[in-house]
């Protein structure tokens, strides 16, 4: 059987693959999978096409990559840095795969799993090469023969293999290998028990006991136990095949492999455990074949997801599914084994040349399995020869590589020239040398990272493997003179490669270590290159052209403002502990880099912000199409270039992220960078949790530093924007830095809002997510800032979250202005970043951790206030109330911005604590943005919209609306939950003919709360609307249960939604919501809410308030979260949306209720609204049916009174929306309710866009807040941080809605 060139390998990291796909970087799955199923020859056409496409993409990426090593598309190439050798073969696939989502992943995955004629598993990194893939033959082993006569169907083979690998291999390896079932769910059992069974078998070698224990466990699905004897026997035999892998006499072992990019550096490989001689048969290494009909191919295979182990049989002229232990054999262009048919449907492996202990067992998948002539192959041989994915990386780099390997004196490996024969002994010597160099390299790179440019370059060498550019980026990191690095870069890259290429080959860091650093090797390389790169940019504003080469390093912000910063970043990388990864850690964990860079010097904040954004952006970009510049820097650069005409926007865009001059270059490099970031982000995503940990700590430091360095930040920004926009940027940044002037900030915010609106309008299509994010950013002003630009900010937001804690003091002084400034910039950035990629980024960037951290920080801040005795709360409320009243008055007066600004000032002055809490959030994340989170809401069309409407209207339209707005109070007042729901429903039901209720929420979350919140976040508006309205009939019955849950999520969502002051400024006139239903995504343009008096001016939030009546910005009076958009009747409901849901989940002690009531006492509507806000803050618990609701009764009455007075006749859209973001100490409610859903459909869509940040805050708050919220209204869920950031969150949410 001829190895099918298109055969894809069964990757161990099916799950990873999926992740990749979510990340876009590696997950683009090989669309060529179908083609990959075809044989090399017969399917060559298909494969060729996909391959050529991949090749083209790859080559284009390659070029970019050459220029800037960190290009995501070339990620395969770049990953080659650390993966360099490994990547060479596999990576191209990954690259191709990433790019075309077709062939590469195939190749990569294919080689591992595919047992097909294509049978090589190209990516050992993929995790499992399909030994059998090359051959269509049967398994050689007796076990394989067990099923010979009764060959399994492809579906049965897939099921049995998925189960067998999940029972035996996955527990042993510690991660989930590739699965044929793309919806495979990990067994809900204690994997330690399964691991113990395998470990015991390794000691006892007793198959019967092991199989008996496996069959007796709870992990065998019931339906498999009910199968007939033949089917049961087949499963038994397949399990035995995998157990034989652990037989002491098998002569091989399955190990984790981190070479191939396809699996994001985590796959499996087969290593020899004894010496094999030529012509030996490895009997236990068997694979099973199941012939695929075209119908079965269509039904079972999903391109780029599970077509990794499909091969084409030239003998049978059909595609075959290859599964079994041999599917984990990876491909190598100089393979030491081949597949040998042992029966009709089994194959084993025959040794082609002597294999030493510890050597990887590889097979040749085919001549064109990984693209034409295997141009995307990442195998060790291709790495050594400088071919495949490693070809054309960079002459210097390749030279360094080949020289490092001792293969040639002058890059003969590339092509041409003489070189020594590749004898086993020579190759082994090279490997041993590389190994010895590896350890040295590791220490060197760690040392060098912190030490110097050349060393950094060496660290970047990994990145450089992608090309000299990568190395240069790293090298330049330390050196300000990066312009000249072009030539130096190559040399440095070469020298570094010589040192580090071995590193790459050896894979010095374990995947675990990398993940702990929050990145994959490739990410590390890219980040290091980027960090260096950014430094280059930073140092060479003038040399943008030069930078330009490294432009994908392009995160200018990331590049250290100063050499010191660069060094700090490098050091941080070193701290991250990976020579290559360390750098990435620094850059990738921009937070880390940022921290060190911030510490480094004046430019540090820029650098820090950039690096964090870079990392996040990478993640985002991986997910997002190349369109959105994943990193804030990137986005900024392109946006800046595009919107240079918009000075305001430019400054915002430029922030520290981009230099005007670079903007033009940015446009060129952005695509590259985006791709780089894509891959990085993808990897980062995988390692997000770990990286977030490290980066969080770093970011804490960083933010502390940043807080102290805000002025420095200003300066660095000033330095950076030398071009036309530099002045504006400087000004804006300075404003940000000197967030002290709330008034100025307010003005800036307004301007930013105007600009944002313009920009948003301009970039509306892609900006839907971006705008939503902008709101989110506004909410978490500082933290979201970067986030906005980089959704990638996930990391940065995390970092920023932790930083926030340190920043609270500073926040208090700067908060108001900062938030507006940040908001402005964020909005601008957002507008800039509104590329389609942004949406992807949005989706990809939901970082449970960052938002959580952010939320926690906000919580901490709020809670710091909240923790203070209730008195503080009350005083805060009083201050907030006063501020709110004045604000409301101003707003009513029709001076939304002015009122906002003064409100902020007053709130700040009157409520320093509150202000601090609120602003801390904004202040903390000038650079960092909270990534958006994506929630998966399963919505069900409400059974009887009319009935629901009637119920909601009947339940007290006005009260219902108010209840909605003040979740606890109004609910209580009107029908409790019913009224809340009705508030949303009112908006939704009356406006929308059809309403949906949330059937199920699935979110990506790190914390239990996150899931709900995430979902809510994504669908927050719909969720709010639906949650409130979903069970109109049920609601009364299920009120307690459902409403509690809904309220909690709602309060979270509302807090998220309630547009922060930023939304007040920056909400574009036109809002866009992005709804994702299953595979469909709909973008809904929400017409600008009818400008209701000054309300429209204020923002969606305020605009829905109809002149800011209730929409005094809760964020300004951080405790005054009652951003109620009372004019619910007006279209402003879109902004109101956030408010409606803004009911704060955080319960406030009943004691709080008292103050709110007091607050209510003010007769003025503004004060009422404020009171409501306070009350709702106090009574947020009441929002949740906890008994707190009762406590909220008074509040709710007040709210009702207030809202009724306010809305009187406008009960429908969200009267009740007086958002009570009852963040316990910080009334972050800031929900602009009322108009919440003038346009329910929009609202519906908006939910998807809810910023994860608010969600994170909500989520985090539960942790912190719950401690504080004894009144277990579950309300604790709404973190104080949420409330503090509640305003922000709410605003953010509203902005989301509005912008979306």
Curated annotation (Swiss-Prot):
The modification Phosphothreonine is found at residue 930. Residues 677-688, 698-707, 722-735 have a biased composition (Basic and acidic residues). GO terms for cellular component: heterochromatin; nucleus. GO terms for molecular function: histone H4K20 methyltransferase activity; histone H4K20 monomethyltransferase activity; histone H4K20 trimethyltransferase activity; histone H4K20me methyltransferase activity. Keywords: Chromatin regulator, Chromosome, Methyltransferase, Nucleus, Phosphoprotein, Repressor, S-adenosyl-L-methionine, Transcription, Transcription regulation, Transferase. The keyword NAD does not apply. It comes from the Eukaryota. Histone methyltransferase that specifically trimethylates 'Lys-20' of histone H4. H4 'Lys-20' trimethylation represents a specific tag for epigenetic transcriptional repression. Mainly functions in pericentric heterochromatin regions, thereby playing a central role in the establishment of constitutive heterochromatin in these regions. Acts as a dominant suppressor of position-effect variegation. This is Histone-lysine N-methyltransferase Suv4-20. It comes from Drosophila melanogaster (Fruit fly).
């Amino acid at each position: 059987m001829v190895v099918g060139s298109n055969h894809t390998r069964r990757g161990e990291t099916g799950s990873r693959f999926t992740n990749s796909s979510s990340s876009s970087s590696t997950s683009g799955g090989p669309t060529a999978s179908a083609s990959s199923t075809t044989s090399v020859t017969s399917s060559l056409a298909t494969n060729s096409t996909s391959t050529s496409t991949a090749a083209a993409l790859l080559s284009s990426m390659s070029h970019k990559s050459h220029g800037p090593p960190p290009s995501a598309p070339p990620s395969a190439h770049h990953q080659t840095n650390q993966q360099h050798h490994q990547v060479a073969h596999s990576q191209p696939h990954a690259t191709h795969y990433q790019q075309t989502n077709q062939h590469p992943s195939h190749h990569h995955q294919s080689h591992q799993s595919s047992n097909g004629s294509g049978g090589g598993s190209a990516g050992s990194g993929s995790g499992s090469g399909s030994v059998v893939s090359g051959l269509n033959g049967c398994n050689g082993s007796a076990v394989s023969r067990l099923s010979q006569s009764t060959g399994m169907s492809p579906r049965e083979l897939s099921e049995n293999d998925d189960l067998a690998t999940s029972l035996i291999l996955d527990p042993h390896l510690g991660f989930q290998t590739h699965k044929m079932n793309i919806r495979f769910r990990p067994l809900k059992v204690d994997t330690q028990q399964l691991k113990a069974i395998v470990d015991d078998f390794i000691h006892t070698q007793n198959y019967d006991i092991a199989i008996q224990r496996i069959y007796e466990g709870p992990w065998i699905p019931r339906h498999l136990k009910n199968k007939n004897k033949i089917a049961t026997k087949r499963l038994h035999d397949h399990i035995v095949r995998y157990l034989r892998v652990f037989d002491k006499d098998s002569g091989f072992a399955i190990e984790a492999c981190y070479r191939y990019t396809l699996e994001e550096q985590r796959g499996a490989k087969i290593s020899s455990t004894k010496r094999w001689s030529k012509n030996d048969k490895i009997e236990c290494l068997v694979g099973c074949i199941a012939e695929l009909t075209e119908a079965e191919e269509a039904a079972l295979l999903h391109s780029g997801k599970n077509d990794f182990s499909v091969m084409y049989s030239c003998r049978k002229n059909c595609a075959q599914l290859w599964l079994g232990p041999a599917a984990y054999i990876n491909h190598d262009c100089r393979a030491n084994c081949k597949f040998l048919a042992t029966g009709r449907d089994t194959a084993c492996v025959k040794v082609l040349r002597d294999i030493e202990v510890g050597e990887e067992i590889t097979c040749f998948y085919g001549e064109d399995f990984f693209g034409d002539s295997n141009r995307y192959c990442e195998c060790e041989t291709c790495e050594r020869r400088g071919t495949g994915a490693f070809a054309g990386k960079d002459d210097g780099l390749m030279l360094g590589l080949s020289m490092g390997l001792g293969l040639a004196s002058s890059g003969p490996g590339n092509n041409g020239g003489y070189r020594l024969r590749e004898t086993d002994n020579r190759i082994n010597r090279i490997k041993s040398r590389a190994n010895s160099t590896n350890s040295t390299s590791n220490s060197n790179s760690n040392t060098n990272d912190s030490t110097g440019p050349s060393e950094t370059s060496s660290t970047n060498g990994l990145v450089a493997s992608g090309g000299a550019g990568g190395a240069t980026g790293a090298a330049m990191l330390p050196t300000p003179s990066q312009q000249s690095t072009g030539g130096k870069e190559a040399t440095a890259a070469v020298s570094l490669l010589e040192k580090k290429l071995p590193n790459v080959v050896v894979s010095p860091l374990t995947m675990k270590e990398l993940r702990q650093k929050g990145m994959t090797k490739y990410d590390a390389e890219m980040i290091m290159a980027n960090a260096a790169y950014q430094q280059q940019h930073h140092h060479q504003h003038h040399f943008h052209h030069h930078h330009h080469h490294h432009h994908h390093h392009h995160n200018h912000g990331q590049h250290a403002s100063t050499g010191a910063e660069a060094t700090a970043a490098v050091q941080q990388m070193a701290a991250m502990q990976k020579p290559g990864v360390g750098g990435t850690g620094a850059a990738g964990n921009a937070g880390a880099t940022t921290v060190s860079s911030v510490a480094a010097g004046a430019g540090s904040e820029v650098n820090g912000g950039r690096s964090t954004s870079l990392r996040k952006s990478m993640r985002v970009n991986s997910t997002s199409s190349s369109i959105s510049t994943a990193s804030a820097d990137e986005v900024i650069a392109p946006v800046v270039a595009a919107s240079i005409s918009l000075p305001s926007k430019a400054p915002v865009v430029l922030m520290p992220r981009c230099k005007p001059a670079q903007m033009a270059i940015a446009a060129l490099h952005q695509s590259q960078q985006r791709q780089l970031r894509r891959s990085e982000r993808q990897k980062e995503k995988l390692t997000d949790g770990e990286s977030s940990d490290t980066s969080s700590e770093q970011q804490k430091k960083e933010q502390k530093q940043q807080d102290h360095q805000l002025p420095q930040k200003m300066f660095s920004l000033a330095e950076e924007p030398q071009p036309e926009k530099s002045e504006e940027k400087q000004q804006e940044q300075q404003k940000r830095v000197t967030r002290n002037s709330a008034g100025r900030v307010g003005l800036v915010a307004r301007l930013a809002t105007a600009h944002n609106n313009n920009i948003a309008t301009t970039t509306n299509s892609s900006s839907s997510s971006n705008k939503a994010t902008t709101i989110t950013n506004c909410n978490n002003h500082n933290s979201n800032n970067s986030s906005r630009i980089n959704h990638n900010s996930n990391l940065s937001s995390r970092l920023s979250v932790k930083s926030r804690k340190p920043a609270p003091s500073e926040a208090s002084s700067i908060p108001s202005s900062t938030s507006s400034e940040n908001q402005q910039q964020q909005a601008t950035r957002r507008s800039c970043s509104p590329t389609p990629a942004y949406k992807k980024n949005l989706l990809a960037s939901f970082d449970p951790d960052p938002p959580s951290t952010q939320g926690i920080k906000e919580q901490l801040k709020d809670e710091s206030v909240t923790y203070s005795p209730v008195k503080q709360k009350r005083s805060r409320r009083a201050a907030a109330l006063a501020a709110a009243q004045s604000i409301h008055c101003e707003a009513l007066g029709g001076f939304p911005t002015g009122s906002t600004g003064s409100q902020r000032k007053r709130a700040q002055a009157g409520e320093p604590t509150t202000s601090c809490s609120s602003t801390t959030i904004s202040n903390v994340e000038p650079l960092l943005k909270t990534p958006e989170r994506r929630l998966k809401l399963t919505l069900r069309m409400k059974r009887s919209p009319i009935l629901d409407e009637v119920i909601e209207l009947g339940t007290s339209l006005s009260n219902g609306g108010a209840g909605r707005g003040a979740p606890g109070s109004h609910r209580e007042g009107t029908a409790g939950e019913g009224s809340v729901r009705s508030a949303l429903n009112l908006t939704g039901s009356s406006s929308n003919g059809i309403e949906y209720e949330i059937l199920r929420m699935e979110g990506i979350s790190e914390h239990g709360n996150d899931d709900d919140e995430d979902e809510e976040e994504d669908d927050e508006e719909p969720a709010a609307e639906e949650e409130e309205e979903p069970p109109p009939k049920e609601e009364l019955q299920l009120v307690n249960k459902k409403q509690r849950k809904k309220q909690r999520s709602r309060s979270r969502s509302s807090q998220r939604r309630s547009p922060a002051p930023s939304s007040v400024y920056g909400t574009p006139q036109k809002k866009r919501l992005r709804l994702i239903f299953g595979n469909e995504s709909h973008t809904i343009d929400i017409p600008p809410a009818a400008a209701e008096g000054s309300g429209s001016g204020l923002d969606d939030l305020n605009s829905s308030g109809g002149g800011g009546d209730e929409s005094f910005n809760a964020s300004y009076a951080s405790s005054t979260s009652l951003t109620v958009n009372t004019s619910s009747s007006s279209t402003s409901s879109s902004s109101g949306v956030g408010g409606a849901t803004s009911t704060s989940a955080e319960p406030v002690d009943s004691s709080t209720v008292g103050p709110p009531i007091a607050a209510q006492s003010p007769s003025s509507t503004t004060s009422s609204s404020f009171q409501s806000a306070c009350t709702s803050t106090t009574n947020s618990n009441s929002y949740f049916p906890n008994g707190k609701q009762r406590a909220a009764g008074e509040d709710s009455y007040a709210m009702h009174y207030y809202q009724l007075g306010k809305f009187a006749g406008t009960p429908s859209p969200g009267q009740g929306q007086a958002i009570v973001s009852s963040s316990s100490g910080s009334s972050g409610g800031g929900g602009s309710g009322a108009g919440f859903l003038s346009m329910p459909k929009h609202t519906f869509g908006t939910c998807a866009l809810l910023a994860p940040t608010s969600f994170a805050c909500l989520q985090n708050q539960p942790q912190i807040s719950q401690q504080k919220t004894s009144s277990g209204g579950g309300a604790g869920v709404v973190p104080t941080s949420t409330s503090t950031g509640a305003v922000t969150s709410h605003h953010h949410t509203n902005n989301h809605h509005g912008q979306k």
